[in-house]
A protein has these predicted regions:
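N-terminal mitochondrial targeting presequence
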Residues: 1-40
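Juxtamembrane/start-of-transmembrane alpha-helix segments at the extracytoplasmic/lumenal side
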Residues: 15-22, 235-253
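Acidic, low-complexity proline/glycine-rich segments
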Residues: 33-34, 38-53
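Electrostatic cytochrome c docking/interface patches
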Residues: 47-72, 83-97, 102, 215, ...
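The canonical Cys-X-X-Cys-His
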Residues: 74-85, 227, 231
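Gly/Gly-Pro-rich "capping" loops immediately C-terminal to redox-active cysteine motifs
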Residues: 83-164, 186-214
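Extended, hydrophilic extramembrane loops/domains of integral membrane proteins
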Residues: 195, 201-236, 240
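Juxtamembrane interface at the cytosolic side of transmembrane helices
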Residues: 242-245, 257-282
Length: 282
């Protein structure tokens, strides 16, 4: 009897120890997962929210009014630091501006050209074939003007970042006061959506910072949406044409498929069921 009671007592103690071990292991796993999540957030930035962009989807096109407003935001806010090297004024024709409006925009810029007949360089008004000029002559000048930080070219920025549209939109609206205990280095700003949490670019969008030509209220969110749409177009200016061509091909191939099914199932059915009998005469 004593031996049996002892064995039962030892079994209960072993079961309790096993339960405590599982609890401790679960707690350690939770702490490890949380640590990994915090480290990932610090390295890659806060998880991005997902927004429904008007041009997402196989049969949806860009909002061209938003592209025009976005170009206005870029020209008045972003162009002070960021270039757009892969876009020419002619690319804006039929997308955001008429040809006359695009020419007027180009002529506002003085472009260095030449040499002329005497071998000298000269300045002339911009033309539709000219690219949109950048704010700095070279990378060194850009870094000198921005305390060592190099503002990236925005031509392909939505393709150069994971989930680019949501990233740009969240980044522009993500500036906030740092959490307690977080020290922001000099010349930097806290933005949890930027990898590392600190970014050299200050908050640029404020309500009413741009006066839209079409009278749309220039709220901070509206400006962020419009400039993000403009940058999406800058990265894929051919997207509307590509989707239209894809829709045409889908329609054409659907007709071919229907025709092929018709001929296989009905037009040629008598040929498939025909039997040839050879009666050999001996």
């Amino acid at each position: 009897m004593v031996i049996g009671a002892t064995l039962r007592h030892l079994a209960r103690r072993a079961s309790a120890s096993s339960s405590r071990a599982r609890t401790v292991a679960g707690a350690l796993a939770g702490v490890a997962a949380a640590s990994v999540a915090v480290a990932d957030e610090a390295e890659h930035g806060l998880a991005l929210p997902a927004y429904a962009w008007p041009h997402d989807g196989a049969f949806r096109a860009y909002d061209h009014a938003s592209i025009r407003r976005g170009h206005q935001v870029y020209a008045q806010v972003c162009a002070a630091c960021h270039s757009l090297n892969l876009i020419c004024y002619r690319n804006l024709v039929g997308v955001a501006y008429t040809e006359a409006e695009a020419k007027e925009l180009a002529e506002e810029v003085e472009v260095m050209d030449g040499p002329d007949d005497s071998g000298e360089m000269f300045e002339r008004p911009g033309k539709l074939s000219d690219g949109i000029p950048g704010p700095y002559a070279n990378e060194e000048a850009a870094r000198f003007a921005n305390n060592g930080a190099y503002p990236p070219d925005l031509s392909l920025i939505t393709k150069a970042r994971h989930d680019g549209l949501n990233y740009i939109f969240a980044l522009l609206l993500g500036y906030r006061e740092p959490p307690a205990g977080v020290e922001v280095p000099d010349g930097m700003y806290y933005n949890p959506y930027f990898p590392g949490g600190f970014i050299a670019m200050p908050k640029m969008l404020v309500d009413g910072g741009v006066e839209y030509e079409d009278g749309t209220p220039a709220t901070e969110t509206q400006m962020a949406k419009d400039v993000t749409t403009f940058l999406a177009w800058a990265a894929e200016p051919e997207m509307d044409d590509r989707k239209l061509m894809g829709a045409k091909w889908i329609f054409a191939l659907s007709l071919v498929c229907v025709q092929a099914v018709y001929y296989k199932r009905w037009a040629w059915s008598h040929l498939k069921s025909r039997k040839l009998v050879v009666d050999a005469v001996r």
